[in-house]
From Swiss-Prot:
Residues engaged in binding Mg(2+) 1: E93, N531
InterPro entries: PRibForGlyAmidine_synth_PurL (IPR010074), PurL_linker (IPR041609), PurM-like_C_dom (IPR010918), PurM-like_C_sf (IPR036676), PurM-like_N (IPR016188), PurM-like_N_sf (IPR036921)
Protein keywords: ATP-binding, Cytoplasm, Ligase, Magnesium, Metal-binding, Nucleotide-binding, Purine biosynthesis
Function: Part of the phosphoribosylformylglycinamidine synthase complex involved in the purines biosynthetic pathway. Catalyzes the ATP-dependent conversion of formylglycinamide ribonucleotide (FGAR) and glutamine to yield formylglycinamidine ribonucleotide (FGAM) and glutamate. The FGAM synthase complex is composed of three subunits. PurQ produces an ammonia molecule by converting glutamine to glutamate. PurL transfers the ammonia molecule to FGAR to form FGAM in an ATP-dependent manner.
Gene name linked to the record: purL
Subunit structure: Monomer. Part of the FGAM synthase complex composed of 1 PurL, 1 PurQ and 2 PurS subunits.
List of residues binding substrate: S94, H95, N96, H97, R116, Q240, E312, S313, Q314, S533
Family in the record: Belongs to the FGAMS family.
Subcellular location: Cytoplasm
EC numbers, comma separated: 6.3.5.3
GO molecular function terms noted in the UniProt entry: ATP binding; magnesium ion binding; phosphoribosylformylglycinamidine synthase activity
Pathway assigned to this chain's UniProt record: Purine metabolism; IMP biosynthesis via de novo pathway; 5-amino-1-(5-phospho-D-ribosyl)imidazole from N(2)-formyl-N(1)-(5-phospho-D-ribosyl)glycinamide: step 1/2
Name by which UniProt lists this protein: Phosphoribosylformylglycinamidine synthase subunit PurL
Tree of life domain: Bacteria
Length: 735
């Protein structure tokens, strides 16, 4: 006997996240009351997570093209040409809400999902990165969330067999009720063997691949498009459950299948599951899709059409198959022990038709499920400008040596070794620069060429001045890639914001995108993929605006990649870039002086490019022994990191024309520290002058301590103890 679907009522519509005007739009579009299954389909396809209804208008203004861009936004992942017939495929995506509800599985399936986005394009994953934001350390849930998220990321990546090579982790009370878990994956493919999601051909079979479908993750995308209240625990069933070993089998089976020529189009079943993947493939190819859900492999009995369509069970793919190669394709998946089921076909009707148990459960216009989704030009208000804080107006509460010692043992600046040692960053044997440097560096194959990878954002800058913060997020990623000697090539972004229905939040979003676009254009650093995560809000309070940037650069010879560690005594230490001593929104002002205030440091994009290009040439010419960009904590923290990494001390001096605490801890942008031999230092200084690059000698390496002239020397061993001690002590509940 056919099951009875619930009646579509205003309450049911509201529970699906659809506003009254959006429901009226559905009625006008299809000319009738939708079935329960159709309501679920619209809810999935028109939610913020899938439709980008609040952000699409502004995303269009971002720069996405360059001669080396093969595929920009709109596919599973972005693709760039990296030479020698190879392409780099990469994307960053959020799994914020699920990771707060169930940190281990939420983070693990975030990794699994982004890996599928990459290998769906025909690329073999070679690296993962992440960007994590947790609440205040003293918040009662923070330890639990850190522990679960880190374990989930490590478990999935390690089991799947891809190294997690880099990331960025910080803490702030603004994330108490909404943590951020942004996962990035990078893969390598032949540039002429990229696979896309666009279906072609009428009557071609649609094939379900991978794991069986269960009830986990139903309405995961809808949940990710809503603000959190106090009922987060009740949403636990919306969190997917991952199996990295099955995903590894799926990877190998898909790559083998792609070599047979059987694949016409392929799409990961991610957010909104079977619904989204089927609709996207059909709509991109201007084709209809007809599904027979009786053929869907299920691991639970009695699943309804609604449940099968909206399940976000992991490790699943949907493919349009060349009908002449069905037997060959099936044999591949049988060999790998995975499901292979023909569940439908392409049609010329431009309709999305779903059948189950002899009934038509859905019959909808396929293009309108995506193209007719609401598109909002939401009201937005620019953030008020904050005044510049002069360093001379700040009374230092500690000596500069004391402030440095304090900063190195703070949650944001301390070593994250406790985190990255839970990730296998060597599993493929391709890691050249391991976690802890400016950017991760991996070797490609047996040759000298490599990739540099980084994730960056400074939310306190974005909150104080969204445009400047957006510029800085991109500039910081570009600078980190440059600091290891890479040529920055492209960006993936992950835009994490609060409720876009609030004009001040939408203003943050628009401002950050303005700054991001300006920086990407100025630095020739196009955006090729990304993700938007809105409604990161709990109890009416949004998170700090966090537009995460994932950067990818190419290194011609990884043997020349620069490292941040001081290598030997007697080297000259040179500071590249102008230093005014900018303390507004600095960690010194926040963690030493107890103030979050002032305008953030401006980013002069012309100076950023000029200084970075100069540093990259120094690295290529092998003129420097160590390089480090200057960011959080300023010059003194960067020097300490270089000294601790190499076990070599330094003696450095501030100029008389900048207040000392501003010189050591100001977060002025576009700056690097380089170390070079004394005999080369004069040549570097002269070359900088010719290039119009500010460069000054501030000291030399040597000894077992870091000495800021006029201050007590601090032993490197003491700095390291503070730097390495905070996070393990915190996680052991010793603080």
């Amino acid at each position: 006997m056919p099951r009875q679907d619930p009646a579509v009522t205003p309450e049911l519509v509201a529970s699906h996240g659809l506003k009254p005007d959006e429901y009226q739009r559905i009625l006008d579009l299809i000319g009738r009351v939708p079935t329960f299954t159709e309501l679920g389909i619209f809810s999935a396809m028109w939610n913020e997570h899938c439709s980008y209804k609040s952000s699409r208008l502004h995303l269009r203004a971002l720069p996405t093209k360059a001669p080396w861009v093969i595929q920009g936004p709109g596919e599973n992942a972005g693709v760039i040409d990296i030479g020698d017939g190879e392409a780099c495929v990469f994307k960053m995506e959020s799994h914020n809400h699920p990771s707060y509800i169930e940190p281990f599985q939420g983070a693990a399936t975030g990794v699994g999902g982004i890996l599928r986005d990459v290998f769906t394009m025909g690329a073999r994953p070679v690296a993962c990165l992440n960007l994590l934001r947790f609440g205040a350390p003293e918040h009662p849930k923070t330890r639990h969330l850190v522990s679960g998220v880190v374990a989930g990321i490590g478990s999935y990546g390690n089991s799947f067999g891809v190294p997690t090579v880099g990331g960025a982790t910080a803490f702030h009370m603004g994330y108490d009720g909404n943590i951020l878990v942004n996962a990035m994956a990078v893969g390598i493919a032949r540039a002429d063997e990229i696979f896309y999601a666009k279906a072609t051909g009428i009557g071609n079979p649609i094939v379900y691949l991978g794991s069986k479908t269960g009830r986990d993750g139903i309405h995961g995308a809808t949940m990710a498009s809503a603000a959190f209240e106090e009922d987060a625990e009740a949403k636990r069933p919306t969190v997917q459950v991952g199996d990295p070993f099955t995903e590894k089998l799926l990877l190998e089976a898909c790559l083998e299948l792609m070599r047979t020529g059987a694949v016409i189009a392929i799409q990961d079943m991610g957010a909104a599951g079977l619904t989204s993947s089927a609709v996207e493939m059909g709509a991109k190819g201007d084709l209809g899709i007809e599904l027979d859900l009786d053929a869907v492999p299920c691991r639970e009995t009695g699943m309804s059409a609604y449940e099968m369509l909206l399940s976000e069970s992991q490790e699943r793919m949907l493919m349009v198959l060349d009908p002449q190669k069905e037997a060959e394709a099936k044999a591949v998946f049988v060999k790998w022990g995975l499901d292979f089921a023909i569940i439908g076909k392409t049609t010329d009707t431009l309709r999305f038709v779903v059948k189950h148990e002899g009934e038509v459960k859905a019959d909808l216009p396929i293009k309108q499920l995506g193209d007719a989704a609401p598109l909002y030009d939401r009201p937005h208000i620019a953030s008020p400008a904050l005044e510049k804080i002069e360093a001379a107006a700040i009374e230092p509460p500690l000596s500069n040596a004391g402030a440095l010692a304090l900063l190195l043992a703070t949650p944001d600046l301390c070593s994250k070794r406790w985190i990255y040692e839970q990730y296998d960053h060597l599993i493929l044997g391709n890691s050249v620069e391991t976690p802890g440097g400016d950017a991760a560096v991996i070797r490609l194959g047996d040759g000298p060429k490599g990739l540099a990878l980084t994730t960056d954002v400074t939310p306190r800058y974005c909150e104080a001045d969204p445009v400047a913060g957006g510029r800085q997020a991109v500039a910081e990623a570009w600078r980190n890639l440059t600091a290891v000697g890479a040529l920055p090539r492209a960006v993936t972004d992950n835009l994490n914001f609060g409720n876009p229905e609030k004009p001040e939040i939408m203003g943050q979003f628009v401002g950050c995108l303005t700054g991001i676009g300006e920086a990407c254009r100025a630095l020739d650093f196009p955006i090729v993929s990304g993700n938007v995560s809105l409604y990161n809000e709990s109890s009416g309070k949004g998170i700090p605006p966090t537009p995460s940037i994932g950067g990818v650069g190419v290194i011609a010879d990884v043997g020349l990649a620069a490292k941040l560690a001081f290598r030997r005594a007697g080297d000259a230490i040179l500071l590249i870039g102008d230093t005014e001593g900018w303390l507004g929104q600095s960690l010194y002002l926040r963690d030493v002086c107890g103030r979050e205030a002032g305008a953030p440091p401006p980013v002069d994009l012309a100076a950023e490019k000029r200084n970075g290009d100069f540093v990259r040439e120094l690295i290529r010419a092998a003129l420097v022994s160590a390089v480090h960009d200057i960011s959080d904590g300023g010059l003194a923290v960067a020097l300490a990191e270089m000294a601790m990494a190499g076990g070599v001390g330094a003696s450095v001096e501030a100029p008389a024309n900048v207040p000392a605490h501003g010189f050591w801890f100001g977060e002025d942008q576009s700056r690097y520290i380089v170390a070079t031999s004394p005999e080369r230092a004069l040549g570097v200084l002269a070359a900088a002058q010719r290039a119009g690059v500010p460069c000054r000698r501030i000291g030399e390496t040597g000894g077992a301590a870091l000495t800021l002239k006029g201050e007590a020397a601090i032993l490197i061993a003491d700095l390291s103890a503070r730097f390495e001690g905070w996070l393990p002590d915190y996680m052991a509940a010793a603080l």
